[in-house]
């Protein structure tokens, strides 16, 4: 655990120290688990935190709030430049830990995460060998140009074109109209030298010469000179302007005027155009979007990072802040964390933070397994399931993380509105994730479409399961994350009581019982949509797109239910794995993790009661019991709240918060930052003598 000498010399808040003394588990042991049981990662993290705390500029995150857009970007470039030293010392692990330890986002993250995920997924081995080291060593800077000013989530509808010129063996990229302008492209506004452009692939027919559209494909394009960084001929590029947040990142626009690139610039791991202009298609149509799935995998994994910061600030502040006495005899006011409505604002999101950590870990492993199978054997068995889950999980986890940060901000009352709390900046920098790489209100449709495919397969008798998933081949077994659809179809249990009795469980709040409730709920929602579609068609409505559109709300909710099940299953599986190895995880930790799992599950049930009651699988009395149990779990977790957020081991510079510092010096820090801000340097504001003073001296 990281504890710099500066923290040791600070006065410790007695309330926080008392909270830490109440812990029922080892904080350092849980921290070890959160770092993949790897001492090397912890040591690297500690060195990076020390590096950050010792830097005169990076260690003062509160100063960001007083900078202009240009000054913010200049600061971000300075912080980015320090990454070179980190990478030299610690390699790629150090790079990732540096990003996670910073208060602000920096431009290099686009090259290292977004571009790198896409390039490594889509580039051939030859292209990787020829180009990737240039981006890795920051000789080139990459970006990912898919979204257009007129098209976002509808990737098939993008308007940028890439025409194969057979006479020269080149491609020609073009922006045919205003709405084809690439827009919102991270890192492109000022920094990127190259970008991956998604464009409609047009190839002349060998028979009549007419252009045939093969759909969106990725191409690597140099946009700026390596000598003076100016835009290359035919390239119009710039920054899109101020945003709600994320302003240290240069989101850009791009227009192309018949720009020629070599045929070899088509990213061709899965598809290519040969010298004769013949298109060699991918084994699976969704392989074109492998890069996008890679970026989503990173977003899914990193939702934990932002949410852990928010709950750390909210919980520490809530144990220090005191308001109202329980009765006149009390000497002190009550900690606001003691109030049940405050617990309800924060504790579910603390539980969600841990759930999302283990979910991100699982999905990252599954993505790596899928890409390995595709690259080595052209095996697309895992792709459909992974693509569907990435769509729904990205939607669920980014939106609920945004909601969690906002709930934590609100839990801090008026001080949560101050930028000095660290929460408004955290939220405004994160909230764009709901729209990035697929709008979160549209992506769930891809998930539900896949779930309906699995249901149709099960109903037709093809429900044999394995640890793999079906792609477009009906002979392949269904996958692990959707196996419950077949299980529920085959199940003889009419209600949860029969399941509890059969499994020999002691209560509906047992994790196995809760997991079963989520499996049944998801199955019922999938089946309900299938029945609604069938009913419409039986009544003569053959307009499938319109039926689908009319059911969009239910479709999105169905995806959410499936993904919440995925999260709970991931969390529970990891707890079982940890508990099976007593040498690496003590029973005290598995106990508190199970309490977090139960809290998260019951909280979701309470928020979606109609789903769980609709077919009488659960009794009303059991729902009432679950509602009361939630408050009991809050009380069980109460002594461990501060220790749980301490296990994230977030340093003060990372949080950038007067409310959430490790030693709890809230009020003096808040006053110090307020009183020393630049706006208070002069007693008279600019313009006072010209505008206000004449009014004071006038005789109106």
UniProtKB/Swiss-Prot annotation:
The keyword Magnesium does not apply. Its main location: other. Its cofactor is FAD. A motif (Microbody targeting signal) lies at residues 698-700. InterPro entries: ACOX_C_alpha1, Acyl-CoA_ox_N, Acyl-CoA_Oxase/DH_mid-dom_sf, Acyl-CoA_oxidase, Acyl-CoA_oxidase_C, AcylCo_DH-like_C, AcylCoA_DH/ox_N_sf, AcylCoA_DH/oxidase_NM_dom_sf. PANTHER family: ELECTRON TRANSPORT OXIDOREDUCTASE, PEROXISOMAL ACYL-COENZYME A OXIDASE 1. Belongs to the acyl-CoA oxidase family. Catalyzes the desaturation of acyl-CoAs to 2-trans-enoyl-CoAs. First enzyme of the fatty acid beta-oxidation pathway. This is Peroxisomal acyl-coenzyme A oxidase 1. It comes from Dictyostelium discoideum. The gene is acox1.
């Amino acid at each position: 655990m990281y504890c710099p000498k500066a923290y040791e010399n600070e006065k410790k808040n007695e309330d926080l120290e008392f909270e830490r003394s109440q812990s029922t588990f080892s904080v350092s042991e849980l921290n070890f688990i959160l770092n993949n049981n790897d001492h090397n990662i912890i040591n690297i993290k500690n060195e990076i935190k020390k590096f950050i705390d010792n830097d005169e500029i990076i260690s003062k995150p509160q100063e960001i709030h007083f900078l202009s857009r240009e000054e913010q970007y200049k600061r971000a470039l300075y912080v980015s430049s320090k990454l070179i030293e980190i990478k030299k010392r610690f390699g790629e692990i150090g790079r990732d830990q540096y990003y996670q330890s910073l208060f602000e986002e920096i431009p290099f993250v686009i090259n290292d995460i977004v571009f790198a995920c896409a390039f490594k997924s889509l580039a051939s081995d030859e292209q990787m060998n020829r180009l990737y080291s240039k981006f890795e060593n920051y000789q080139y800077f990459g970006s990912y140009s898919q979204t257009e000013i007129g098209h976002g989530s509808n990737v098939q509808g993008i308007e940028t074109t890439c025409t194969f010129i057979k006479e020269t063996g080149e491609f020609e990229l073009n922006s045919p109209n205003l709405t084809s302008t690439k827009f919102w492209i991270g890192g492109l506004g000022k920094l990127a030298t190259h970008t991956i452009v998604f464009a409609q692939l047009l190839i002349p027919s060998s028979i009549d010469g007419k252009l045939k559209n093969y759909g969106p494909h990725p191409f690597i394009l140099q946009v700026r000179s390596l000598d003076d960084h100016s835009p290359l001929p035919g390239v119009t590029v710039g920054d899109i302007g101020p945003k709600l947040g994320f302003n240290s990142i240069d989101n850009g626009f791009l227009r192309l005027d018949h720009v020629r690139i070599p045929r070899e610039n088509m990213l061709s791991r899965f598809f290519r155009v040969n010298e004769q202009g013949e298109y060699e298609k991918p084994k699976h149509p969704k392989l074109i979007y492998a890069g996008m799935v890679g970026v989503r995998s990173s977003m899914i994994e990193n939702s934990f990072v932002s949410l852990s910061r928010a709950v750390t600030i909210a919980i520490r502040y809530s144990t220090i802040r005191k308001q109202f006495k329980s009765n006149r005899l009390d000497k002190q006011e009550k900690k606001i964390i003691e109030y049940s409505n405050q617990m309800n604002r924060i504790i579910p999101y603390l539980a969600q933070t841990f759930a999302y950590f283990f979910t991100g870990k699982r999905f990252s492993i599954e993505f790596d397994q899928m890409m390995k199978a595709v690259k080595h054997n052209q095996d697309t068995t895992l792709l459909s399931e992974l693509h569907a889950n990435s769509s729904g999980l990205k939607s669920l986890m980014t939106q609920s993380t945004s909601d969690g940060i906002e709930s934590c901000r609100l839990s801090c009352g008026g001080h949560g509105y101050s930028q000095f709390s660290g929460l408004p900046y955290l939220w405004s920098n994160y909230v764009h994730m709901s729209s990035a790489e697929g709008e979160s209100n549209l992506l769930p449709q891809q998930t539900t479409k896949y779930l309906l495919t699995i249901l149709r397969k099960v109903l037709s008798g093809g429900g044999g399961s394995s640890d793999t998933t079906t792609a477009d081949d009906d002979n392949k077994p269904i996958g692990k994350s959707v196996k419950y659809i077949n299980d529920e179809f085959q199940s003889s249990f009419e209600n949860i009581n029969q399941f509890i009795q059969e499994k020999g469980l002691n209560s509906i709040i047992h994790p196995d019982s809760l997991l079963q409730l989520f499996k049944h709920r998801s199955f019922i929602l999938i089946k309900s949509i299938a029945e609604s579609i069938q009913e419409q068609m039986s009544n003569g409505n053959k307009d499938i797109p319109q039926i689908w559109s009319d059911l969009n709300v239910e479709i999105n909710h169905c995806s959410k239910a499936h993904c919440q099940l995925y999260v709970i299953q991931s969390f529970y599986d990891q707890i079982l794995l940890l508990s099976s190895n007593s040498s690496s995880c003590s029973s005290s930790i598995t106990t508190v993790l199970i309490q977090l799992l139960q809290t998260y599950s019951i909280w979701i049930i309470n928020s979606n009661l109609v789903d769980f009651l609709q077919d009488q699988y659960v009794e009303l009395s059991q729902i009432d019991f679950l509602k009361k149990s939630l408050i009991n779990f809050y009380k069980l977790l109460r002594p461990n709240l501060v220790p749980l957020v301490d296990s994230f081991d977030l340093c003060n510079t990372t949080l950038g918060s007067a409310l959430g510092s490790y030693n709890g010096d809230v009020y003096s820090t808040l006053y110090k930052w307020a009183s020393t801000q630049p706006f208070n340097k002069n007693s008279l504001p600019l313009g006072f003598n010209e505008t206000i003073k004449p009014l004071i001296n006038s005789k109106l």
